[in-house]
Structure formats: structure tokens, C-alpha cells
């Protein structure tokens, strides 16, 4: 039969790993939310005539989230996309700097802009002018 101290140790280990798994699940959900927002932006631009948008890769690479070009109008946008559940979202300075660097490197385009695209969790309408915060399921 297992000793009391061994049972306590096993319970602590179970709690530690279940908390770690829960945190991993939350992190995965947040990443998916961000990727979905980037994908939505790309689809919206690609649905417009003469516009081409591309997701540029993982966050570990020094690239903007989305690159958008219109060769007819000579326009390029670099987009840093942020999605969240709170009322504020922060964009790290280095991500803005990275977008500016990319935008300024394409001098053949007459109009070069950096766009910060934010998506916030919407509120649920429950009546005339009455809204309720949505419950976050992570």
C-alpha cells in the first residue's frame, strides 16, 4: 500500500501536469485566434480586385503578419494583426519597427503604409441598447 507522502506527491504531480496542459490549451487557443484573424484579413484583401495579400509566417521569424500589395495602384501594406478578449491590446515596439523596415524596403511602391489591425471579442446583444460580455471558453 502506498504511503501518505507518496499519495500527496502523486496528487501534486497530477495537479502540476493538469495545470500545464490547461495552460498549453489556452496558449493554443490564443494562437489559433490570431491565425484566424490574419487569415480573415488575407481573404478580405484577396476578394478585392487587383489586391494580393499573403500571410508571411510564424512569429519567430522577423516578418510582418500580413503583406498586401496592389501593383496597379503602386501600394504596399504591412499588417501587424492582433486579436484579443480584453478591452486593450498591446503591440510590442519591435513588431512595429519590423513592419516599418519591411515597408520602407519596397521603395518601388509609391504608397507604403503600416497597418495595425485589431480584433476584439464582441459583446452579446440582449436587448435594446443592452449588451452583455461574452463568456470566454478557453
Question: What are the residue ranges of the model-derived segments?
Answer:
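Acidic-basic catalytic patches of nuclease active cores, encompassing PD-(D/E)XK
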Residues: 2-57
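Domain-level recognition of nuclease-like catalytic cores that cleave nucleotide substrates
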Residues: 2-9, 28-33, 113-138
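Acidic-residue sensor for enzyme active/binding pockets
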Residues: 38, 80, 95
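Conserved catalytic cores of phosphodiester-cleaving nucleases, focusing on short active-site segments
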Residues: 45, 66-68, 74-85
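Structural signal for conserved beta-strand scaffold positions within catalytic alpha/beta enzyme cores
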Residues: 55, 80, 116-118
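Short polar/acidic secondary-structure junctions
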Residues: 58, 71-72
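Short acidic/glycine-enriched loop/turn segments that link adjacent beta-strands
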Residues: 60-63
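Short, charged, amphipathic alpha-helix that recurs within catalytic cores of restriction-modification
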Residues: 87-118, 126
Amino acid at each position: 500500500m502506498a504511503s501518505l507522502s507518496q499519495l500527496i506527491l502523486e496528487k501534486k504531480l497530477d495537479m502540476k501536469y493538469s495545470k500545464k496542459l490547461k495552460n498549453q490549451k489556452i496558449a493554443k487557443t490564443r494562437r489559433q485566434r490570431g491565425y484566424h484573424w490574419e487569415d480573415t484579413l488575407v481573404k478580405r484583401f484577396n476578394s478585392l480586385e487587383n489586391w494580393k495579400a499573403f500571410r508571411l509566417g510564424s512569429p519567430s521569424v522577423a516578418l510582418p503578419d500580413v503583406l498586401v500589395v496592389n501593383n496597379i495602384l503602386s501600394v504596399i501594406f504591412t499588417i501587424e494583426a492582433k486579436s484579443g478578449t480584453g478591452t486593450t491590446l498591446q503591440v510590442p515596439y519591435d513588431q512595429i519597427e519590423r513592419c516599418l523596415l519591411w515597408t520602407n524596403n519596397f521603395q518601388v511602391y509609391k504608397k507604403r503604409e503600416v497597418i495595425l489591425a485589431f480584433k476584439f471579442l464582441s459583446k452579446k446583444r440582449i436587448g435594446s441598447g443592452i449588451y452583455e460580455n461574452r463568456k470566454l471558453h478557453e
